[in-house]
A protein has these predicted regions:
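N-terminal accessory alpha/beta regions
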Residues: 46-158
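Short beta-strand-plus-loop segments that form exposed binding edges in beta-rich domains
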Residues: 485-492
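Active-site substrate-binding loop specific to GH73 endo-beta-N-acetylglucosaminidase modules
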Residues: 92, 105-112, 144-349, 355-359, ...
Length: 668
């Protein structure tokens, strides 16, 4: 038996590993590139796939690991850079203060979702989201805002570094100390919340500690809090600390040390269960929801052998046979953020208003900073049931609507009106007047047909998607002093929602407007929401954009209009993705035209399988849920030579759109 074990370990395992290496040393195909991108990024654009198919697995993985050295950070909302208030000062539970901090949360959500869509370093963002779901801090109930933005920056900066360093920093992070009540933990009045979650959710897992350990860890953490009046920064209060000796998991922490967190961290990471727990969470998030103790133990060994350096661990994870096993492809369910952000990145959609995406995410069950509990979001098949599958299809339909009008970008000197609409039978129409003279009549393109949507299972839960009307500069006066939007539909079921008017690169949201006439039947509605034929007037004057976003924090709240986030303008992405058909053809050229049909390439790209293969090739993750809403994939495209360019492009869009209604699109 000893000889057999020796033979297996010394000869068979190395040979198997060499076989794996020889296979993975070849350039990846589209399916492999898509698989890697779906796991380490969000979605997979044709350009990203085309760039990876020339690389081996090792080269591609190293590319993503190298990107962790220089993650891109989003421009913070202006309020984040201002002096931090005492969030719990007198009056903090007043309606005005609650709404202001909710508006701050909204701005942070809009910025982060926009950054996920646009970032050139998506792996860093993927890891930041992973750690956000591991070291959970929540906006509610304390309604502390700016420190949440700082915490995500910490995850972005250190999420691919060393877990020991990350854990130490998290235990001194103002948002973590606030969210888990350690700001109230003192030697005389212990609070055990952070101590318990540190062991149960962050390191050891359930069953590997006892209540005595919880008490001792809470003693270590006593005095670690924030300076409420000093910018809500981390503070270690010596007079509130317990500097006596502690025994944690049988290991001593010497008395007298002012700060014992580092020693506590070393004790926790010395336990084999910690490496196994962390490896297991990564395996479930990046490889498969089906536990694999053998693979997890092997990866845990990599963590321990490298003193919890995450880079070699991530490399071992992403190059493991389990990661690339065909059995584990399409084995993970896309979270709502995966679905929405992944669609936007895959198809090159960068909407100027991100809060509508956040509202879709809320309906689907996942918005940043709003995890249901300190345990984070339930993953895997918990995302899918009959209701959420219908909602997901409706959300994807809204995103296709946005993509349909995504090329409407104002040029310098143009006037832009950002609006959405609802109607029954008769499309919404409005006029635009500048300085009293009519310059345009606008008819909605992607408005929401309420009757049609109700028949598809949407009972008003999802807002219509924004679109942009553009009046070219040649139709405008040299100086714009006043803009008036007037709803002119004679249909009482027609509704218009105006999010902003843009003049000279500045956005004017409805809170800066007034109804005209002021006594119109629907003038009591929030400004920007047209329920009758009425005008909305904007006076156009210069303003400071940074200050405006601060002022907007005190704007009214509304379920449709993005009052508090409309003026969060980010830099336009230069050298953005080419039009979808062009990007797809570039991917096809890289793969090799003639080697695969457009239909099969599209299937590999979006669904991870050729569309002509049997639908039952891989069993659905939740067949009883997914199969009833399956839609047939259109495969009626004609050869390129038999159709015109426009028809060929339309056929491609129809094909891709049909694929995104397939239940398989919810898997990655």
């Amino acid at each position: 038996m000893i000889f057999v074990g020796y033979f297996f370990n010394r000869l068979v395992l190395p040979m198997a590993f060499l076989v794996f290496l020889s296979v993975s040393s070849h350039a990846m195909d589209v399916g492999e590139a898509r698989h890697l991108l779906q796991r380490v990024a969000f979605g997979a654009s044709p350009a990203e796939v085309a760039a990876l198919v020339e690389l081996t697995r090792e080269e591609a993985v190293d590319h993503f690991l190298d990107s962790l050295d220089h993650p891109e950070f989003p421009e913070p909302p202006p309020f984040v850079s201002r002096p931090r208030p005492d969030y719990w000062a007198s009056g903090w539970e007043s309606r005005d203060m609650i709404l202001q901090h909710v508006a701050e949360r909204d701005q942070m959500q809009a910025v982060w979702i926009s950054h996920m869509i646009a970032t050139p370093t998506p792996f860093a963002e993927r890891l930041a989201l992973f750690w956000h779901g591991h070291f959970v801090s929540r906006f509610d109930p304390g309604r502390v805002s700016a420190p949440l933005f700082d915490q995500i920056a910490l995850f972005r900066r250190e999420g691919g570094g060393n877990f020991r360093v990350l854990l130490r920093d998290v235990l001194r992070d103002p948002m973590m100390l606030t969210s888990l009540d350690n700001v109230w933990n003192t030697s005389s009045h212990p609070n055990e919340n952070l101590a318990r979650e540190l062991m149960e959710l962050f390191t050891l897992g359930i069953g590997h500690y006892d209540q005595r350990d919880v008490r001792e860890v809470s003693r270590v953490l006593a005095g670690h809090g924030v300076d409420f009046e000093g910018g809500w920064r981390y503070r270690f209060a010596v007079d509130q600390a317990d500097t006596g000796e502690k025994i944690v998991l049988g290991q001593p922490i010497a008395a007298g040390s002012q700060d014992q967190i580092d020693r506590l961290t070393d004790i926790l990471l010395a336990q084999p269960q910690t490496a196994e727990f962390i490896a297991g969470k990564f395996y479930a998030a990046f490889v498969s929801i089906r536990p694999n103790p053998e693979a997890t133990n092997r990866l845990a060994g990599v963590l321990r052998d490298h003193d919890y350096e995450l880079r070699p661990f991530l490399r071992a994870l992403l190059l493991s046979p389990e990661f690339w096993s065909p059995a584990n492809r399409g084995d993970l369910v896309k979270s709502p953020i995966d679905l929405v952000v992944g669609f936007c990145r895959s198809f090159g959609l960068t909407p100027p208003d991100a809060m509508v995406l956040v509202t879709y995410l809320d309906k689907l069950g996942q918005t940043p900073f709003m995890a249901p509990s300190v345990a984070g979001w339930r993953e895997g098949t918990s995302w899918l049931n009959m209701k959420t599958l219908v909602l997901r299809r409706l959300v994807v339909s809204r995103l296709w609507d946005a993509l349909r009008v995504a090329d409407r970008t104002p040029k310098p000197g143009d006037l832009a009106v950002r609006f959405s609409s609802e109607f029954i039978m008769v499309p919404t129409v409005f006029t635009v007047r500048v300085n009293g003279a009519e310059v345009a009549t606008v008819r909605q393109t992607i408005g929401l047909d309420l009757q049609k949507q109700r028949s598809q299972g949407d009972n008003g839960g999802l807002k219509p998607m924004w679109e942009t009307a553009i009046i070219p500069a040649k139709n405008l006066p040299a100086e714009i002093r006043n803009v008036e939007i007037t709803h002119v539909s004679n249909d009482p079921d027609s509704r218009l929602f105006v999010n902003w008017v843009e003049v000279a690169g500045r956005r004017y949201p409805p809170q800066l407007s007034r109804w005209s006439p002021s006594d119109a039947p629907c003038a009591g509605a929030p400004r920007g929401m047209f329920y009758c034929n009425v005008g909305l007037e904007f006076d156009i004057a210069p303003f400071d954009t940074q200050q405006a976003t601060i002022d907007d924090l005190r704007a009214d709240h509304n379920s449709h209009i993005e009052y508090t986030t409309a003026r969060l303008q980010r830099e336009e992405v230069q050298d953005a993705q080419p039009p979808l058909e062009q990007a797809f053809d570039m991917m096809m050229a890289r793969v090799g035209e003639g080697s695969v049909s457009r239909e099969n390439l599209a299937g590999q790209w979006l669904l991870g399988r050729p569309v002509l293969s049997a639908r039952a090739e891989k069993p659905a993750l939740v067949p009883s849920v997914a199969q009833p809403v399956a839609q047939p994939i259109a495969m009626t495209m004609q050869p390129a030579g038999n159709t015109g360019t426009a028809e060929r492009g339309a056929a491609l869009i129809d094909l891709l759109r049909s694929m995104t209604t397939d239940p398989q699109y919810n898997l990655k």
